[in-house]
Amino acid sequence: MTTPSNQSRLTQEQINSVVTLYSNGDYQEAIDQIKALNASYPNVPFLFNLIGACYKELGRSKGALKMFETAVKIKPDYFEAYKNLGITHRDLGQFELAVEKLKSSIAIEPNNVDAHYNLAITYKDINEIDKAIESYKKVIEINPKFAAAYNNLGNIFKESGRKHSAIAYYEKAIEINPKFAEAFNNLGNTFRDIKKREKAPICFEQAIDLKPDLEFVLG
């Protein structure tokens, strides 16, 4: 959660207090404190974005959307609020709106890796596979060490039957993050699919060692 650069109205102590409550998972207490601050500072977009994030964590997605919309109405170039709108719309199954808002966030911060990553996830959700691949590749162009993007690309290529490309992406994810249990599991399943059964058990064992409760480890 980013904090406002212009702190002329809110004190740093006030900002730190609500951010700490949010970071500690004390969402309702954070909401109560933010509402009290809103009475004195009614047009601070940071507060609306943060209360929206709290609502989202509490499962109150419609309330979250309202707060994020208020934040961008006050501050039309508020990157994080647009990104939060996109993610929340996706969570609600409103994929066209999710894409629209995530693209708006990227227009503000073109090289923000998290926005591109969430856009890629959204495209995959609506089976826009080529656009998902393009967005994931943008993620790794911006941050070549983003292991989850390589793993997700591996999943896309595996699902489309391009198993050897999938293996290359899973192996890259593991190279970046040797403790990436899900990538080991995915790699094992792909080796099994292409009949390299001698390699698959090694990957499954690594996955189990790293994350014993990993679901569907033998996929």
Indicate residue ranges for each PLM-predicted region.
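TPR-adjacent "capping" and linker segments in tetratricopeptide-repeat scaffold/adaptor proteins
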Residues: 1-13
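Terminal low-complexity/charged segments
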Residues: 13-16, 141, 175
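Structural signature of tandem alpha-helical TPR/SEL1-like repeats
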Residues: 23-32, 57-70, 91-104, 114, ...
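Alpha-helical segment of the N-proximal tetratricopeptide repeat
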Residues: 12-40, 53, 57
